[in-house]
């Protein structure tokens, strides 16, 4: 009989496999060497360079993966961003990051599907809930993005701009409270059983009660796990779009009977 493991442990195992099966050995062997590493060095975390490492996104939460076995140094990220601005591309970094994101997004989507099935809403009820929560979803994404933008501004010592964006963030949060109140007024009439008073967050898969207070809902949507999945889904969609654009360009340039100048 196989031993049981937690979802976080399984995710950590998958991420480490994607980063390279022999990484831990190489990291321990060379960690004592103090030298500047090239960005392609396998000891440097490519997820950290391209976007956000899952180890960082869920640090300190119930889904914590522990500490990333690869290097996270600000100087490497700055170097990567500088070279990207200069026109250099790192498709292999993006592929590695996308592979890791795919694991998380697909697993989360599977959990969401199971959770939705457990609630057993009728098709009509599901459609009605989806319609009334669409505006709420848009606001959640904007709040998450603005929070990340404020963090970036603070790290860049853009304090004035950060304060200005903080005011806008509070306005968005206030607007979300108003929309959430409208949503609850509608969704409380959908289904009569206690089970049907629940809904599933279609970003992170958490169960939410439509009867929750604004504060409890805000705690969820501004929570580290939810915002972590917001970030991963944004980066996943962006990289998938880049892949489709790149593949389309390659196909167009190789079509027979066409001349390109």
Curated annotation (Swiss-Prot):
Component of the U1 snRNP particle, which recognizes and binds the 5'-splice site of pre-mRNA. Together with other non-snRNP factors, U1 snRNP forms the spliceosomal commitment complex, that targets pre-mRNA to the splicing pathway. GO terms for cellular component: commitment complex; cytosol; nucleus; spliceosomal complex; U1 snRNP; U2-type prespliceosome. InterPro entries: Luc7-rel. Present with 2270 molecules/cell in log phase SD medium. GO terms for molecular function: mRNA binding. This is Protein LUC7. Belongs to the Luc7 family. Transmembrane segments: none annotated. Residues 123-190 form a coiled coil. The modification N-acetylserine is found at residue 2. Component of the 18S U1 snRNP particle, a subcomplex of the spliceosome. It is found in: Nucleus. One of its GO terms (biological process) is mRNA splice site recognition. Keywords: Acetylation, Coiled coil, mRNA processing, mRNA splicing, Nucleus, Ribonucleoprotein, Spliceosome. Signal peptide: none annotated.
């Amino acid at each position: 009989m196989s031993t049981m493991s937690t979802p976080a442990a399984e995710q950590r195992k998958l991420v480490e496999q994607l980063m390279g099966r022999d990484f831990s050995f190489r990291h321990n062997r060379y960690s004592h060497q103090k030298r500047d590493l090239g960005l392609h060095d396998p000891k440097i975390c490519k997820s950290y360079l391209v976007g956000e490492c899952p180890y960082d996104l869920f640090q300190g939460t119930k889904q914590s993966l522990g500490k990333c076995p690869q290097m996270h140094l600000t100087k490497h990220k700055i170097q990567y961003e500088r070279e990207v601005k200069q026109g250099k591309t790192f498709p292999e970094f993006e592929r590695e990051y996308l592979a890791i994101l795919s694991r998380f997004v697909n697993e989360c989507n599977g959990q969401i599907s199971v959770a939705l099935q457990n609630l057993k809403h009728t098709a009509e009820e599901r459609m009605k809930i989806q319609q009334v929560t669409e505006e709420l979803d848009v606001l959640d994404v904007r709040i998450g993005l603005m929070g990340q933008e404020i963090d970036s501004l603070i790290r860049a010592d853009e304090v004035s701009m950060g304060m200005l964006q903080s005011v806008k963030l509070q306005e968005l949060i206030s607007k979300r409270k108003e929309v959430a109140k409208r949503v609850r007024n509608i969704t409380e009439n959908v289904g009569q059983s206690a089970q049907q008073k629940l809904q599933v967050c279609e970003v992170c898969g958490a169960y939410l009660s439509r009867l929750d207070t604004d504060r409890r809902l805000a705690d969820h949507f501004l929570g580290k796990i939810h915002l972590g999945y917001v970030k991963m889904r944004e980066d996943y969609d962006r990289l998938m779009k880049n892949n489709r654009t790149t593949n389309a360009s390659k196909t167009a340039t190789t079509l027979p009977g066409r001349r390109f100048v």
